[in-house]
Amino acid sequence: MTFNLFAQDNYPTPPVTENRLFYIQHSKNFNTYVYDANFLIPNYLSEKEPVNIYRIVYTEGGIKKPLTTFQRKLAYGIDFFKISQNMYKLKLVAYSGFQLVMKVGQDGKAFVETTVNNQTIILTRMFLKMKDGRSDFNPKLEYVLFYGFDNNGNKTSIKFVPS
């Protein structure tokens, strides 16, 4: 099911980087978790760390910081598995149910594909709507909005409600 959803009101857009894959924002605050491809040299991803993950802390003036150990191991970190040269399967540590596949296109740019509700998209952003009344140490998702492009290059957004 595809929805015509717009960006959340007043949420900042992180500064664009050359190797941006996607970013994640959530309903608790404006802080943003950014995922950039990590190239050793042009067209070749680092096998040791193919994705560079960091956060932009808008609650502290928009400064860039590494993930905390807690964030990396339990929330916004990723596990990765090499499929072939410049192709990796990625899993978010907080929810391994989403299969993300990172590839490098013929233009040398990296991108991430995922399938949500039987629709494959090139992912550019995720928004996590957290259930109200939960602590930060025991959060529950109400839904996830996936933003990106469909197979025809059209902008799309998909709402996923975890069961």
Annotated model-derived regions:
Residues 7-71, 155-157:
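N-terminal export/targeting and maturation segments
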Residues 8, 162-163:
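Short, solvent-exposed mixed-charge patches
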Residues 27-29, 82-86, 136-140:
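Short, ordered beta-strand-loop transition motifs
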Residues 50-121:
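Mature extracytoplasmic domains of secretory-pathway proteins
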Residues 76-78, 131-134:
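Short secondary-structure capping micro-motifs at structural edges
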Residues 116-133:
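Charged, amphipathic alpha-helical segments
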Residues 133-159:
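Short, exposed beta-strand-loop hairpins at the edges of beta-sheets
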